[in-house]
Structure formats: structure tokens, C-alpha cells
Amino acid sequence: MSRQNLEEIIQTGIADTELSTEISTAIKRPRKYKVLLLNDDYTPMDFVVEVLKHFFHLNEEVAIQVMLQVHFQGKGVCGVFTRDIAETKVALVNEYARMNQHPLLSSMEPE
């Protein structure tokens, strides 16, 4: 390999590094969404805690705090996720509540 070829490879490598730096700074983080549980007058509190523990992996203490927030304030934040994950969690929670004959509703909103 000649010195000229080596210099070309080095220059190309530097140019590629500069290009990848420019590209990576243009990429934005995905928007986050809050997944909410909405209060109703019929869903038992223990079912809400079960949902929070099962679908959002909250421990008992935190699940109870969120459940009380839902109960007293009308809604509570279960977690913050990217759009796809938030949509999936909302769908799973709503389906699980329907399967168990509870009117509990979950929704999502941008953070």
C-alpha cells in the first residue's frame, strides 16, 4: 500500500466521521407519552392495583399511590413511554378490564 493510498484512506475516514457526526446530531429522540388510568365509580380498587402491578411493573406501595391518585383526582399517570409502547399498554389494559367486566379505561397523552 502506497503512502498516497494510506493518506486517501485516512482522509476518507475523517470525512466519514464528520458526516456521521452531522447525521447523528440531526436525529431527535422519540416523543414520550403518559399512560393514564381514568377513574370510574365501579372498578374495585384492588383490580386497579392489580393492573398497575401487572402491566406497569409497579410495586405494591407505588401501585396503591397511583390508584389513590386515580380515585381522588380522576386520573393517574401509570408511566411514560414511547408512542408504540404507550399504545400497546393502553390497548392491553382496556382489553384486560373488559375481559374482567370492569369499565376501567386507560388513555395516553403527549408528555
From Swiss-Prot:
Q: Which GO terms describe its biological process?
A: protein catabolic process; proteolysis
Write the protein's name.
ATP-dependent Clp protease adapter protein ClpS
Q: What does this protein do?
A: Involved in the modulation of the specificity of the ClpAP-mediated ATP-dependent protein degradation.
The record, for Pfam families, names: ClpS
**NCBIfam families this protein is in?**
PRK00033.1-5
Subunit and partners:
Binds to the N-terminal domain of the chaperone ClpA.
Matches recorded under Gene3D superfamilies: 3.30.1390.10
Q: Which organism is it from?
A: Legionella pneumophila (strain Corby)
Q: Which InterPro entries match?
A: ClpS (IPR022935), ClpS_core (IPR003769), Ribosomal_bL12_C/ClpS-like (IPR014719)
Q: Which residues form a coiled coil?
A: none
* Disulfide bridge positions per record: none
Query: Which family, according to UniProt?
Result: Belongs to the ClpS family.
Endpoints of the signal sequence: none
Say which domain of life the source belongs to.
Bacteria
